[in-house]
Design a protein with these regions (language model features):
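Catalytic cores of carbohydrate-active enzymes across secretory and cytosolic contexts
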Residues: 1-223
């Protein structure tokens, strides 16, 4: 069940009204993954097939991917759950051995996927194409702000953050390039540290969204 108020796979259930309990899941995720247990550091999660469609080269490619610089330059944590292309699995293992703020589980673990959705502050999903996409909807439901590329279902379900008004439910990038992903994650991390009231309001807005989630899921199943 993808519902933070009823999810039996997370340590602490919560709603938009009790969103402070979300923090328990973050601390549990940090501890489980061997990260510094610190509520103040923004945690970015990704759950993905390690396939070209998902923008993995732009994140993880050894020569030009942005993951290494992101983790070196920004005071953030990065948790990865996924499996797929061998080169990418190997590169993630290399990154993990060199970066104390990047931790990964190569494979699939259903309970961990729920903990990442509940415990992350942001969810990275820079897909090359995404007809519908479910993870960004789970993220919104769990008050975990999506960082997505403007394509398909991602563009339809995530409203880009407006720094002036504080409106939005996530952070949207237009171009699938390492620099664009780096910049957009950096923007989210900046907002985390400097626009805390905006972030909290966005989480509330995300959790309360009614955009036909069930209908979208049904359409996805039909496809």
């Amino acid at each position: 069940v993808w519902n933070p108020s009823k999810d039996k796979k997370i340590p602490a259930n919560y709603t938009a009204k009790t969103i402070s309990k979300k923090l328990e899941n973050k601390l549990a995720l940090q501890e489980k993954m061997g990260l510094e247990v610190n509520p103040d550091i923004p945690l970015v999660g990704i759950i993905t097939r390690l396939a070209d469609q998902k923008g993995i080269a732009e994140i993880f490619a050894p020569t030009y991917g942005c993951a290494y610089n992101m983790c070196k330059d920004m005071n953030m944590q990065f948790v990865i759950l996924g499996s797929g292309e061998t080169w990418c699995e190997n590169e993630i293992r290399t990154l993990q051995s060199n970066l104390p703020n990047l931790r990964a589980y190569i494979g699939y673990d259903d309970a961990l996927s729920h903990l990442i959705e509940a415990g992350s502050d942001f969810f990275l999903m820079p897909s090359r194409y995404e007809p519908c996409g479910l993870n960004q909807m789970y993220s919104l439901l769990y008050g975990t702000l999506p960082i997505v590329r403007r394509t398909g279902g991602l563009a339809d379900t995530v409203q880009n953050y407006n720094e002036q008004t504080g409106e939005g439910t996530g952070f949207v990038l237009d171009n699938l390039t390492p620099q664009s992903i780096y910049d957009t994650v950096g923007w989210a991390v900046y907002a985390w540290y400097n626009k805390k009231d905006h972030i909290e309001a966005m989480k509330q807005r995300a959790m309360k969204q009614k955009f036909g989630w069930d209908e979208s899921a049904k359409k996805y199943v039909e496809v």
